[in-house]
Curated annotation (Swiss-Prot):
InterPro entries: DNA-binding_RecF, DNA-binding_RecF_CS, P-loop_NTPase, RecF/RecN/SMC_N, RecF_2
The protein's name in its UniProt record: DNA replication and repair protein RecF
GO annotation (BP), single: double-strand break repair
PROSITE patterns given in the database record: RECF_1, RECF_2
Annotated source species: Shewanella sp. (strain ANA-3)
Protein family per UniProt: Belongs to the RecF family.
Matching Gene3D superfamilies: P-loop containing nucleotide triphosphate hydrolases (3.40.50.300), RecF/RecN/SMC, N-terminal domain (1.20.1050.90)
UniProt-annotated binding residues for ATP: G30, Q31, N32, G33, S34, G35, K36, T37
Described purpose of this protein according to its UniProt entry: The RecF protein is involved in DNA metabolism; it is required for DNA replication and normal SOS inducibility. RecF binds preferentially to single-stranded, linear DNA. It also seems to bind ATP.
Gene name for this UniProt entry: recF
Record has DNA-binding as a keyword: yes
One cellular-component annotation, GO: cytoplasm
Keywords: ATP-binding, Cytoplasm, DNA damage, DNA repair, DNA replication, DNA-binding, Nucleotide-binding, SOS response
PANTHER family: DNA REPLICATION AND REPAIR PROTEIN RECF (PTHR32182:SF0)
């Protein structure tokens, strides 16, 4: 799977651009503020309906316009597919896939699986369990068609349960929701656990390539003691939940634990090693997707030269090439990427003040 055409209209400082990317390595270079990262952001927006840089999606709309438009043609095994997205400053979003209106943004994510390696993505190991849970759920969503519905129901029931707790409801009033919570939690937890087990099998070899001297252990924690029955736990913790006004334990507290010996990885490894670990996680996740559903991710790699030294840039790019996936990578100077590849990039684009030029 790859993008074979990308149209960008009124996205940040890009007024209008049309790209015909290669299915291999696409190098996008230009000075800071030129708009090169905006191209990656536009691809991500098309696949996720939001930015990887700002939670306020209206900010990505060009200041002089009231809407942005993104359009892409995807090359898929079954033939080409067309995706279009329009976001208005009011917050309204219109999405079409092959001319048909799409109501759920999750359909975009399913159609266009994207992996991001940016300076911000290294927060995976530092910002607490939420980002690591999102990492697991990305894989669970793509690997099991039952996951999304169960995950939506967990969130719905948890919201209702927390509202009842804030209303000082009796346990009799909460019991019905607890039965629902347990049912959907079991589904979500089983899929998450199965996914992490599969990821681990791939991850060991990839971590060995990036960090041969470091023994990293990866494990899944479900959000409560695995030896405790979840239904009994909810009942026994009801007084505590009532006092705090929210559900203390459950799938919303799940985490991906990464340890070196007895220490968390972030305490045992240097910042450079942690960056390599995140790269290994992203590579493994993309490879597992290909194994499980025979679909490639699209990799967006931003500002690589500032994040990794020449040796590790070369290693990461080799791993990315080996996945067979389409890759978009940015740099200020093209030589920093070209010199790290065994062969020239399949396609190069220069960006200056929001204008994109193909370099032949």
């Amino acid at each position: 799977m790859s993008l074979i055409r990308l149209n960008i209209d009124s996205f940040r400082n890009i007024q209008l651009a049309q790209l015909s990317p290669s299915s291999g390595i696409n190098l996008i270079y230009g000075q800071n503020g030129s708009g090169k990262t905006s191209i990656l952001e536009a691809i991500y927006f098309l696949g996720m309906g939001r930015s990887f840089r700002s939670h306020l999606s209206q900010r990505v709309i060009n200041n002089e316009q009231d809407k942005l438009t993104l359009f892409a043609t995807l090359n898929l095994p079954r033939g080409d597919s067309k995706i279009g997205l329009r976001r208005f400053r009011s917050g309204e979003t219109e999405v079409k896939i092959d001319g048909e209106k799409v109501k759920r943004l999750s359909t975009l994510a399913e159609t266009l699986p994207i992996q991001v390696i940016t300076p911000e993505s290294f927060s995976l190991l530092f910002e607490g369990p939420k980002s690591r849970r999102q990492f697991i759920d990305w894989g669970a969503f793509h690997s099991d068609p039952q996951f999304y519905a169960a995950w939506v129901n967990v969130r719905r029931v948890l919201k209702q349960r927390n509202q009842l707790l804030r209303n000082n409801s009796s346990y009799d009033q909460i019991q019905y929701w607890d039965r629902e919570f347990v049912r959907y939690t079991e589904q979500v937890t089983e899929i998450r656990n199965r996914y992490v087990d599969s990821l681990n099998e791939l991850l060991k070899g990839i971590i060995g390539e990036f960090l041969p001297q470091v023994d990293v252990k990866v494990s899944f924690t479900r959000g409560w003691d695995s030896k405790t029955d979840f239904a009994q736990l909810l009942e026994s913790q009801y007084p505590r939940d009532l006092a705090t006004g929210h559900t203390v334990s459950g799938p919303h507290k799940a985490d991906l634990r990464l340890r070196v010996g007895s220490l968390p990885a972030q305490d045992a490894m240097s910042r450079g090693q942690l960056k390599l670990l995140v790269c290994a996680l992203r590579i493994a996740q993309g490879k597992l997707l290909k194994q499980q559903i025979d679909k490639h991710s699209i990799y967006l790699v931003d500002d690589l030269p500032s994040e990794l030294d020449a040796q590790h840039r070369q290693l990461l790019l080799k791993q990315l090439v080996d996945t067979g996936a389409q890759v978009f990578v940015t740099a200020i100077e093209p030589a920093a990427i070209v010199d790290s590849l065994h062969m020239p990039p399949s396609r190069m684009f220069h960006v200056e003040q929001g204008r994109v030029t193909v370099i032949e």
